[in-house]
UniProtKB/Swiss-Prot annotation:
The keyword GTP-binding does not apply. One of its GO terms (biological process) is tyrosyl-tRNA aminoacylation. It catalyses: tRNA(Tyr) + L-tyrosine + ATP = L-tyrosyl-tRNA(Tyr) + AMP + diphosphate + H(+). The gene is tyrS. The lineage of its organism: Bacteria, Pseudomonadati, Pseudomonadota, Alphaproteobacteria, Rickettsiales. This is Tyrosine--tRNA ligase. ATP binds at residue 235. Keywords: Aminoacyl-tRNA synthetase, ATP-binding, Cytoplasm, Ligase, Nucleotide-binding, Protein biosynthesis, RNA-binding.
Amino acid sequence: MEFKSGFLNTLQVRGYLHQCTDDVALDELMALQPITAYIGFDCTARSLHIGSLMQIMVMRYLQKFGHKIVVLLGGGTTKIGDPSGKDKARAMLSEAEIAANKAGILATINKFLNQGDGVVIADNAEWLGEVRYLEFLREIGSKFSVNAMLGLDSVRSRLDRDQNLSFLEFSYVLLQSYDFVELHRRHKCVLQIGGADQWGNIVNGIDLGRKLGLPQLYGLTTHLLLTSTGEKMGKTADGAVWLDAEMFDPGNYWQYFRNVADVEVGRLLRLFTELPMNEIAELENLQGEAINEAKKVLATEATAICHGKSAALAAENAALQVFEHNDDAGLPHFPLHKSLIAQGISVAKLLQLAGLEESISAGRRLIKGRGCKINGMVVEDADHALTHADFARNSGYITVFCGKKRRIKVVVED
């Protein structure tokens, strides 16, 4: 389908769009006039990570095409915990932890958006904290069918595996649905956007609005951020790829995108840069060693959007100093049998096997002191399990640096 509205057309062409309720009607509306859309973020950590970057980029495009945005921070729903995609309940956070996380997430989002340009920051604690239980059950709870709620993926997956699902988590969909209704009442919000795992919650919010007599509401989801093999992206030997510079520094952020698999380059250029599509097509079609130039462009452009142009250029220059003046081809090779990474091998164990450290405990001490890098990225988790995926995305090998002088190329062999 070819959309009339610039926003929806961009989402489709660049590969964000997963599902949309009544896309024809929403397209007509967005082509006719600016609308107000919202995206919600629960305050479960001090920063967002690249799993949320899809939604952040979508917000940038909402601004670009003149639409208004409500950024909803889940000061209230964080106390409950969204069960979507989770095998067990989240740990309960204190009020102070939620407040600190809220401040950190807001600071992260502020880096990506032009503040004051049609952006409203809301916190659902404002209205959920005022809810009277019996009135909520009468007005909102009566509009939900337990039969239908049991069919939600977030619920069914836990029950099918005989995993505990508390009533607290089971109630989450009611609260998210109520958020949509409340945001329409307060800000005339007509569109909710979220990841693909939020589809059930979004549709329930639309249905609640209909039952309460609100005008037509819409929902839209983006694809989850997965690799070409279906694994979640955003995990490294350094942990999650956070968008906060203190939690994941710009140099590591640059290296993360520089080290993606060749097959991912075009897709990530479309998603996480704002380069014109014709330029992306040229970069995507590079072959052999030339694809590394496209990876550098991806890394620099993505880092500039997240951390600023100067930080991106500094990260690029630092990487060039390491890699282009210390060619991988000249590094000593260490063969690693593929059976050792079938179940994953810890970084500390690899350092011992490769002779870079005398023992696993020595490797742990080195990593604790931030003295080890894999593919240019500082390793902080000594127990991170390196698997085939880590090697496959870098043509079957990784480079390991310990301090300034001990450098090897670890190659997987049969």
